[in-house]
Amino acid sequence: MARDLEAVIAAADQALRTWKPVWTPFLDGALLEQAQERLAGLAELEIASRGGYPGAERQRLLLQRHDAAIAADEVAIGLMGLELGGNFLFDPAERQDFRSGLLALGAGEGELGDLWLRGDRGAQAILTAAQAAALDGRTAMVRTVEVALEARPLHELQLPAPRLPRRFQTVEASLRLDAVASAGFGLSRNRMAELIRQGRVRLNWQPVSSPSRQLTVGDRVQLEGRGELQLETVTATKRERWRIELVRC
């Protein structure tokens, strides 16, 4: 991550030196927050972010000199959609399986934006226009399934519905990560524990592999494709359980 952050800082320096807008590669949520915090102190730098649709998890930062900044939506970002079509009825795949298939074809991590599943028919993704063009018409192997790749304009994609913040309460026997996250993300506790052990869950953007990890107020739990949970309040009940107020976004 340190190398990726240095690349963002170098892009900011380029924008300031050349007085021209610069788009970074796609950044994940952790790096996006870290980069924004690191660059926030530069008063002469204007920062915006875009990922191809509202609520995108992976986004690119637009870096501009404040004195010469123009509206972010007026700066060409060069994004394209990609259809990943195949029959996954008998061999269901996860998002990471599709991402790994694209990386195996030589796609750059920073060229790949969000990717979402389309049932047993495959997936769709947002990429840089250049990367989508390079993959258009090729095939990839995702698990045991051959997948056809087709570049598409963004408006032809079936984009995920915008995720609006939702506040709710749950009562749990413990503050274990698997218990709270399963309630918050609407998955079974066994499935959540499996995802945690697989490294698919992050706690405050840091990798975590122990389902029994204890949570505290202020903790944030991230799960790719399902957003983030924030622990707002925790109070003990008379029956020695925990009433937890969560915000999912």
Each model region followed by its residue ranges:
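Ferredoxin-like alpha/beta domains used as RNA- or RNAP-binding modules
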Residues: 1-178, 184, 207, 221, ...
